Amino acid sequence: IDTLQTHKDSVSCKECGTSTKIDSYGNFLPDFKFRTVEEWDSWQDEFYAEYYKSCDSETILFSDENVCVNTVTSEHETKNVGSGKICMYKEKFVFEGEEKTIEFDLSQISDMSIYGRKTLVFTDGTGAHYEVKSEKLINVRKYLTIYNLKKEV
């Protein structure tokens, strides 16, 4: 989780070294643990659900550094909140900026989604819109997955 890298038709894990290739139909080679991206995705969802259940509310589930957080107005104007680190817990999403820390209670986030390949967007309980961006490619899907798991509880 969060350690995959791709190059052309190859997919590999930076952590354990597992690798495979994708054929012209979008399937993995037959000797791989998963046959399709959908199978791998289902496994990942199960992993996240078990991981979520196994952690307490003070455990950082995930974090990413060197992100930029902006607010987006109803006129689509972007205002920089700051740069820093984001952390996902079971009950909250935290931005640890260079100048300030902002905590968002997950139950007060009314909507969260992914924009593009590396931008997480969400709306808080006051109706303020935020976007979390990174210059490098980060796995923003993990944050959305935990948010959705929290909504199900």
Give the label of every model feature segment.
Residues F104-V153:
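Acidic, Ser/Thr- and proline-rich intrinsically disordered linker/docking segments
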Residues G84, Y89-E91, D105:
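Short beta-strand or tight-loop elements
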Residues T18, G84, E98-K100, T126-H129:
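Short acidic/polar mixed-charge low-complexity motifs
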Residues H7, C87-Y89, I114-G116:
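Structural motif
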Residues T3, S83-K85, D111:
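Short, surface-exposed charged micro-motifs
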